[in-house]
Amino acid sequence: MAKGKVLEDTPLIKQFFSVKAQHPEAVLLYRVGDFYESYSDDAVLVSKVLGIVQTKKSNGDKGYIEMAGFPHHAIDVYLPKLVRAGYKVAVCDQLEDPKFAKKLVKRGVTELVTPGVAFNDQLLDQKENNFLAGLAFDKDQCGAAFLDVSTGSFQVAQGSLDYIGTLIASLNPKEIVVQRGYEKGVKEKYGDNLYISTVEEWAFVYDAAVERLKKQFNVESLKGFAVDSFPLGICSAGALMVYLEQTQHTGLKNICSISRIDEDKFVWMDKFTMRNLEIFNSSVGGEGVSLVSVIDKCSSPMGARLLRSWLAMPIMDIKELNSRYDVVQHFLEAGEDLDKVQEYIGNIGDLERIISRAATGRIAPREVMQLGRGLSQTEPIAALCKDHGVKALDSLISKMKNCSKLLDRIMKTMTAEPAAAVGKGEVIAPGVDSDLDELRNISSGGKDYLLKLQQSEAERTGISSLKISYNNVFGYYIEVRNSFKDLVPPEWIRKQTLVNAERYITQELKEYEEKILSAEDRIYALETRIYGELVAEIQRNIPAIQTNCRIIARLDVLAGFAQLARDNHYNRPEMTKDLTLDIKAGRHPVIETLMPAGEEYVPNDIFLDNKKQQIIILTGPNMAGKSALLRQTALIVLLAQIGSFVPADSARIGYFDKIFTRVGATDNISRGESTFMVEMLETSMILHNLSERSLVLLDEIGRGTSTYDGMSIARAIVEYIHEYGRGAKTLFATHYHELNDLEEIYSRVRNFHIAVKEVGSQVIFLRKLKEGGTAHSFGIHVARMAGMPKEVIQSAENTLKALEMNDSQHIVSARKGEIKKPVQTKAGTLESDGSLQLSFFQLDDPTLESLRDKLAGADLNNITPLQAFDLLRSMKDELGL
């Protein structure tokens, strides 16, 4: 090597790094012949994530470079794995036919695939939207845009940071686009697990955003979409259009409209509520059952996605809800027609995503045929649904678009069973194009000719084993085994010698080969043109097809509600404008489906209003069903406010605008928050957002700290909701039996308990809600059921007896069975080996009596939460704690 010579990459590797420099944040898949390859650091990553071999490729003067790759036809298998692993992937294709390239083949990125910008079925959940979100901020306001490129759904919203947080929790975007530099703040506010991408500040400029959207929708103004009052939402939507351009997704014809999400039209449910109610995911991971898995009776992916959208954003519009109830009622009474409608809808498939692939020009021939089959089902569905005297149903059917011309063209143009792709077999039907038919005859006839030539040459030469074959190196050839090579005619031209045979060509063979191959090339060109014209026609019909998709999805959900009601004996709720919740014989929609054979769920009544019974203090044993009762109440309300019938004999519901739950908690270690801190944060958020139409479900508030602290906080919360909560209807489950006395103090507080029956040493859970409080938790019985060692059970029973005796001088030693004198502190509290806490309201110690007097003197009707905490702090100081 010459001294001082600069080592250079080969032209191919130079080109790779040149493209990589344009997309440094992405893994580059680089098309080389029949393979996609990655080099250098990308090769190491690709090998690790995909589990494929990492090897080396020659790189000129530099020796070798790391390489990993896979066959091009396997990209639909490997690309989704990279994206699911959290990587953006740049697909770099050959932009010219290598046969005609004079030097290095021209290449360029044809697509940048990210979690939020995907069309590949392997990356998409059939039953969920795949939202890409954009966020724009201005002081304490935030604008949001949610776009699903796989369906064309495009929505904008604007409001407080917390409100946008509820939308993020509800819609679960797979990727969020923000201004560069905002990544950390967004993750701190909305969650560390979010996938964040960035664009520059200019992408969020309002005027430019408006122009981008007008261009996308091909309109002169956005006024027709009624999004003018959401300027930050428009900025976010414009930024998403910039991001699509940067990821090589331009001119998507399925994105043809935009709508607004109005805060005052939907029920507020924060991420804690959605988690606690297990709407989409069970709290026990893959082992549990979510609400959606029980109620989803949809026959199509489009309906399943709409159902999830309704669950994420229940509505308050009574007229709209009654329209949904009317359709469900009709289907419920329709008998066999319901089954037929569901069968037709099931045959439609996922038209939304099929036409989205058509919008990109990447729709496969078999998907075009599925589109045709889907369109053919709309007419019989309409015939079954119209003219039944159901106004809501007739209105829906009247909005369906006539796509019969497109359907006719698809069915006439395509073969019944098309090949997977143009060039892989027949796609266009016979009779569509006379030139195509003629070329096909030449191609198929040419193959027949070759068979005849093989037979005639075998007879002429006497070489019985002669055969004509084809390969990519020198086309058609005649193969002769060595034992017959002496019989080869002199005009044959030898092309290849093998171990046991020789291969020859003839002038006649080459001439006919050229004719056949020319015909096949022309067939490919003609099929490509005709197919492209059909796809263009589909693209022109996208808005009409999208309208029909939305109607079919709605029918699918409502028909599913009817099946749910039929199978599980649900009844129509009555939605009102008053402030009353009256459920008769309500059941938990999930738990009742999991009951053992022969065992029925015990139904319960719930009544809440703003005048006499605003707050229910619910006590009862462990495992009695308090938490289930809380959840079932919220789930019945939720089902009613998405348009479903409910698991109850009857339900009269004054519509709710917010549903809050505080049920269970876990540590948030990543943020340094304990279980109790998480509990307090969630409860604080609830107390700050109460309204007269709020439904509040609180379960075991205060159990994450000491008994006195927890009980004091629980009591203060109940008092606050009663006095300052604007009449928010509340179910408060607790083991603090001392809270039962609140019924005597506050006019709208009522005590209830879950009944049990004691038979000897056994406890039978009756699961029935009864009036009045209870002072028994039966925790030891539950411990016995859990299989605790008998020594532990005996010790616990001894300790419980001692506590119930409330002997301030002696505590029974559970371990030794002997009487032990406790240690008395300066503040008069008792300490023992078990660190036991005695009842706070039966005292004979002067210090504790003083504290009791302080509590008795507190003006609970006027005290603020802050003053209550100050009082609690001073009491702790007096105790020397």
Language-model segments: residues:
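Extended, charged coiled-coil "arm/hinge" scaffolds of SMC/Rad50-like chromosome-maintenance ATPases
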Residues: 498, 502-536
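ATPase nucleotide-binding head domains, primarily ABC-like/P-loop NTPase cores
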Residues: 40-41, 230, 299, 304, ...
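Amphipathic alpha-helical transducer elements in NTP-driven molecular machines
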Residues: 9-13, 29, 36, 40-43, ...
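Charged, surface-exposed helical/loop "interaction arms" that form contiguous linear patches used
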Residues: 360, 364, 374-377, 430-431, ...
